[in-house]
Amino acid sequence: MSDDASTPAAERIPNKGKLAKDLNEVIRYTLWSVFKLKDTLPEDRAGYADEVQELFDQLAAKDVTIRGTYDLSGLRADADLMIWWHAETADQLQEAYNLFRRTKLGRALEPVWSNMALHRPAEFNRSHIPAFLADETPRNYISVYPFVRSYDWYLLPDEDRRRMLADHGKMARGYPDVRANTVASFSLGDYEWILAFEADELHRIVDLMRHLRGSEARRHVREEIPFYTGRRKDIGELVAGLA
């Protein structure tokens, strides 16, 4: 179940209720994988991006979708690029991850952070569907982070949690251009939820995150780092721009 009645208002989509009902029946795993360069890449990078793009094309034919590759360089000292992918099964994503690491580019990278999650219907707002699952157009920028609720959050009365999440969602209504992806990761790693915000303007994510700091629901968050933020680029542009 998604913890999120707290995400920005959805775009106006015809038959949105039916769409949400259908998509809530879908099991779809998603994975964010962050890497850093072991060393600077050689000046001659011929084949680095082509090999990865060929792999991505092969994966797409098996229903493994690469939603984006992202340039994280400079926003953190310990990360250079991130891949966001999703598939029907966790096994498919593990296979894709390992196939990528066997490429020339993959061998030049060191894993930094990788976390898997999947969509579960929202407890209090079943119409909330992650943007990736609704097949919305990917935006230019992304900010991904995990979070863990307080120990007493799940013991609170339903009406209290419903109210706090509804208030949190109302605070985000002024940011409909920031698309949310909140997915469950219980037992898949060290976190309960993974959240990815997408927007065409980076400052909109910054402003939304700052604004939501004022919500009552924030009292019930005990972990929400690390953050991985960057620009979406095709793999050729990304490789060309790396150090």
Curated annotation (Swiss-Prot):
One of its GO terms (molecular function) is metal ion binding. One of its GO terms (biological process) is heme B biosynthetic process. Its EC number is 1.3.98.5. Fe-coproporphyrin III binds at H168. Its cofactor is Fe-coproporphyrin III. The keyword Heme applies. Keywords: Heme, Heme biosynthesis, Iron, Metal-binding, Oxidoreductase. Pathway: Porphyrin-containing compound metabolism; protoheme biosynthesis. It catalyses: Fe-coproporphyrin III + 2 H2O2 + 2 H(+) = heme b + 2 CO2 + 4 H2O; Fe-coproporphyrin III + H2O2 + H(+) = harderoheme III + CO2 + 2 H2O; harderoheme III + H2O2 + H(+) = heme b + CO2 + 2 H2O. Pfam families: Chlor_dismutase. Involved in coproporphyrin-dependent heme b biosynthesis. Catalyzes the decarboxylation of Fe-coproporphyrin III (coproheme) to heme b (protoheme IX), the last step of the pathway. The reaction occurs in a stepwise manner with a three-propionate intermediate. Belongs to the ChdC family. Type 2 subfamily. NCBIfam families: HemQ_actino. This is Coproheme decarboxylase. It comes from Streptomyces coelicolor (strain ATCC BAA-471 / A3(2) / M145).
